[in-house]
């Protein structure tokens, strides 16, 4: 089923008459469809030792958790979770009528060239930017409650 959803999301006509081009970023766990100023992320239906997106419900929960967690640091990017639906005649739509067949994270895109990796590649990562970023990360983590039952360093060793 995901193959037909990926085909649908890869088609500019799926987003309306004004969309001419879609860029697609594929990772080991997701497909991200860049559409104008929007981005839609589809979690791959898979199960790995460290995550489980194998069912529709697993993917819905993962999308909701991603939005909830990432809105804390990027509320201007994370819009929400949208269903991919299939009408009785089999037509797919984003947030349309019919049965929900998958879930998407809807995001506002940020400007091209603003990835930290691109700053590094272009030798534009200044000391002040790195220090500001480190301070933001420190402040963020300082304000979070510790997860005392998560397994600590032993759990991290199992992941890494």
Regions found by a protein language model. Name each.
Residues 2-160:
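Conserved ATP-binding subdomain of kinase catalytic cores across diverse folds
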């Amino acid at each position: 089923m995901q193959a037909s959803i990926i085909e649908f999301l890869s088609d500019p006509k799926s987003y309306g008459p004004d969309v001419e081009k879609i860029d697609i970023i594929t990772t080991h766990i997701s497909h991200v469809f860049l559409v104008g100023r929007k981005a839609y992320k589809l979690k791959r239906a898979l199960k790995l030792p460290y995550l489980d997106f194998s069912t529709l419900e697993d993917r819905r929960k993962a999308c909701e958790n991603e939005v909830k967690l990432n809105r804390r640091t990027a509320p201007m990017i994370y819009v929400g979770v949208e269903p991919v639906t299939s009408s009785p005649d089999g037509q797919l739509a984003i947030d349309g009528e019919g049965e929900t067949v998958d879930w998407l994270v809807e995001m506002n895109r940020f400007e091209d060239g603003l990835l930290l990796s691109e700053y590094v590649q272009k030798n534009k990562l200044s000391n002040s930017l790195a220090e500001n970023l480190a301070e933001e990360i420190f402040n963020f983590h300082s304000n979070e409650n510790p997860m005392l039952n998560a397994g600590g360093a032993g759990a991290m060793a199992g992941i890494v």
